[in-house]
A protein has these predicted regions:
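Short alpha-helical segment that forms part of, or immediately flanks, the ligand-binding pocket
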Residues: 304, 327-331, 345-346, 352
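Short hydrophobic beta-strand element within catalytic cores of glycosyltransferases
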Residues: 326, 335-338, 348, 356
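Conserved donor-binding/catalytic core segment of Leloir-type glycosyltransferases
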Residues: 40, 217-238, 259-260
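A short, well-ordered alpha-helix in the C-terminal region of glycosyltransferases
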Residues: 369, 376-390, 397, 403
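Conserved acidic donor-binding segment of nucleotide-sugar-dependent glycosyltransferases
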Residues: 350-361, 369-374
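Aromatic "clamp/platform" in nucleotide-sugar-dependent glycosyltransferases that forms part
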Residues: 318
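C-terminal alpha-helical cap of glycosyltransferases
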Residues: 394-414
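Nucleotide-activated donor-binding/catalytic signature segment of Leloir-type glycosyltransferases, i.e.
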Residues: 263, 267-305
Length: 414
């Protein structure tokens, strides 16, 4: 069963002071031409990841601009989401023995949802979990878009060979960057649209510094000492073990340093519990290492507080679609040390926002520099905030999606 996610309209007016005038004008013009257009955003979960956060804000803005926008999530049991998590990892390059039984399970759930989709002008399908639904709907009149948020540049051949025919039945595909496109994908149209953050969401809105610090202190963290922070799902690709190893190297040079790993348990990610249990052992052994989840009261507002209190944010990703936590930290004026992978270099360059790294040793070296040179760290972070303001705030993403929808519908009616 498809689940409709309740979304409150978000007036565009409060975003206008952040926009260059031409961007605001283009959004207004596109929205006027799309008034009443029925747009469905379809993904696997309503909480726990960057896609869900994006859709909550994006759909709200589209509604306020007059589009008949909806957000729905697919249902499925634990067996289905175990299959889709394996598929997700395989598309990012992990070797995967994708069995016939798993393929059948995946297709059965997708087929069951197809009958519920009717009456839309545009359907935007996010990531691999619902990617086969298009196959079972018949041609219809709707325009279908597959929106891929992960790095599929070197997928496992078996998994991608299975999924590719279903992806290619869509009218267009959207990737974060051109480098993510699998080499053998053939589509009528491809677009490249990076994600963005909502500066007025509970995770990113401005907060008084004393409120942020007191909130973090309530979780037992010493806010008078340096704090390293990684905000990421508990996923091997986010390398929480590498983050801990980095922290341990930094602690040799800066004994007062602490590390907080903050992540959420998403409904479509059963593997997260395995990763969480593996790192929770280290948490118990080190009083300066903290592991928090949404299940112990660390929601979006608390993440905001942690990011504003952190001295340095770490994003020790091995593979990354975009890494929204990088832009979130830079928006708050906090320097970032992050893996040079996926969409992270779009947001961050050495000396502009922070530093890109490929090893634990490099990460530790850069963090020690930032801890020992707070004035330089503040200047580096300020430069990163300017990049985010120009390129990675929600109105730019809204404009890009409205452009795509307008162009696709114009072509369909030609």
């Amino acid at each position: 069963m498809l689940n409709r996610v309740p979304v409150q309209p978000k007036p565009i007016d409060r975003y206008l002071p952040l926009l260059e005038e031409p961007l605001g004008q283009e959004i207004s013009r596109l929205a006027a031409s799309l008034r009443g257009t029925r747009v469905l955003q379809l993904n696997a979960t309503s909480y726990g990841g960057g896609v869900a956060e994006l859709l909550l804000s994006l759909v709200g803005l589209e509604q306020s601009l007059g589009l008949a926008a909806e957000w729905r999530t697919i249902g499925g049991d634990e067996a289905f989401f175990s299959v889709t998590k394996q598929l997700h990892n395989a598309l990012q390059g992990r070797p995967s023995p994708f069995t016939e039984e798993q393929k059948t399970r995946y297709l059965t759930v997708n087929r069951q949802h197809a009958a519920e989709l009717d009456g839309y002008d545009v359907v935007i399908v996010h990531d691999p979990q619902p990617a086969a639904i298009r196959h079972y709907t018949g041609r219809g009149h709707a325009t279908w878009v597959w929106r891929c948020h992960i790095d599929t540049s070197a997928p496992d051949e078996t998994a991608w060979g299975f999924l590719r025919p279903y992806v290619e039945e869509h009218d267009a595909a959207v990737f974060t960057m051109a480098q993510f496109v699998p080499p053998d994908l053939t589509m009528p149209r491809m677009e490249f649209i990076p994600p963005a953050i909502d500066p007025f969401s509970s995770k990113n809105r401005e907060l008084p510094g004393d409120l942020a610090r007191s909130t973090v202190a309530e979780f037992g963290v010493d806010v008078e000492r340096p704090l390293l922070l990684q905000v990421a799902r508990f996923d091997p690709w986010k390398d929480p073990k590498g983050a801990i190893d980095t922290y341990q190297l930094v602690k040799r040079e800066v004994p007062a340093v602490q590390l907080a790993l903050v992540g959420s348990m998403a409904g479509d990610d059963p593997e997260a519990w395995e990763v969480f249990r593996a790192i929770a052992h280290d948490d118990r052994a080190d009083r300066d290492l903290y592991v928090f989840t949404n299940l112990v009261g660390v929601g979006s507002l608390e993440v905001n507080c942690f990011q504003r209190t952190a001295t340095v944010v770490l994003q020790k990703s091995l593979r990354e679609g975009f890494g929204l936590a990088v832009s979130e930290a830079l928006w708050k004026g906090v320097p970032v040390v992050a893996g040079a992978t996926g969409g992270i270099p779009l947001q961050l360059q050495d000396g502009v926002g922070g530093f890109l790294i490929t090893t634990v040793e490099q990460a530790a070296q850069r963090i020690v520099f930032l801890l020992r040179h707070p004035q330089e760290a503040a200047q580096i972070a300020a430069a990163g905030r300017r990049v985010v303001t120009e390129h990675f705030l929600l109105p730019r993403l809204l404009r890009d999606e409205l452009r795509l929808i307008h162009s696709l519908l114009e072509g369909a009616h030609a």
